[in-house]
Amino acid sequence: MFDEPIISSFVFTNEETTQTFHHQWFSQGQLHECATCYSSIDADEPPSQHWLRGGEASQGLHLTKQQQAVMDIIEARQIETFFFCDESSKDKLEHFMGETCARGIPELLRWMFQNNTVAVEFNLACYVNAMDQVLIFQSGSLRADHHYDVDESVGVVYEMLMQRIENYLNCSSEYGMAECSITRLKVQVKRIRVEADGQSADSSVFALPLQLQEEEGLTATTGCSTSEAELASLRSAYLKHFRECNGYFPPNMRVNLYGLQQCKTTKELYVVPYHISETLQQLPNKNFLILNNIMGQFQRLHELSTPVNSIERDQTSSPLKDLHCRRCRTQFSRRSKLHIHQKLRCGQDFSVDSMHADIVEIYEQCLPISRSVFQHACYGITKPKTMMRKGQFVPIECDWRSESSVKVQHGPCVVISNAQHNSPCKFY
């Protein structure tokens, strides 16, 4: 995610036989050409073909058969707790946690937006090995109401956790960040769902992404007077022509439709034309934004108060005003990040705890999730944790036939223990 303010332009260039779309942005006085937002179609094709051929299809969540099988187990067993583990135990504090919060945890939360899930509520806990003990730093709970909010939500939680870890270490010991490590990250997730047959009946449960909620013109106003009957008719017409005509809408469909795309480079959301109809008589066309779920399936039409062309920001726009939290004075480059920070109440609900040096936490019979997806090992927790004292249990990489005073059941385990050991997976 780019943290500095950016001013984007989304440019359509018409030539004799082709229409080209590309994304540019200005940052720190320089013009950047985006390498990921580019499309070219025939000049006589509707703009929807830009997104149907490449952008829109590629932005949905695509799971392999193995990943879908894992997701089915998560569903069936109602797994809500996950651990990311750095089994090498060689990386310093920032590396494992930063990498996992940038890629692994956001991807896991996006998985959770399947099967009629409209929002997820989550918190993170990191186990910091410092001062010959394990310190547990836990965030407050945060609700992400749209799958496009996941990256920024996790990013803000990560920054706030890192700041609290650093402040705690500076105040409590001679240890610095460089002398500490993290080998375990816990994610607790609660999914908020809607009934499958109630999706079209109550579209208010499908929120706009945070990056769009503050944009002038993108939120419907009291002047948007489309009735429920008109919306239902338009929704049916849109779905019919989308399925049967692959985005080629008839000229007599007197509305302007827009789609939503996310730049893979800057993670910025932008609204793009999908179907623009000529205006007849003196009544302007109504404008609607097409909202899809994470699988690319239609959710609802969101009415816009003005056409998108009139609200698009360009390089001549006035600079973004300074954004800061009135309570703690923290500054932000995006209004959406400030909103997330305020939902977390400036970190008021964050906490720190510690594990006794002789205590070991064991999570047995965990569900392994593909490392190729998350870089580091990830496990779904299927059973309550077991608290033991050292020396009482069989180690993870043991001969399961060996005798022990405590029997650990077969299957992958997650172990959390004192930092004096080089690897939490290979001791006793």
Curated annotation (Swiss-Prot):
GO terms for molecular function: DNA binding; zinc ion binding. It comes from the Eukaryota. A zinc finger (C3H1-type) spans 325-346. Keywords: Developmental protein, DNA-binding, Metal-binding, Zinc, Zinc-finger. InterPro entries: Znf_C2H2_type (IPR013087). This is Protein terminus. It comes from Drosophila melanogaster (Fruit fly). The lineage of its organism: Eukaryota, Metazoa, Ecdysozoa, Arthropoda, Hexapoda.
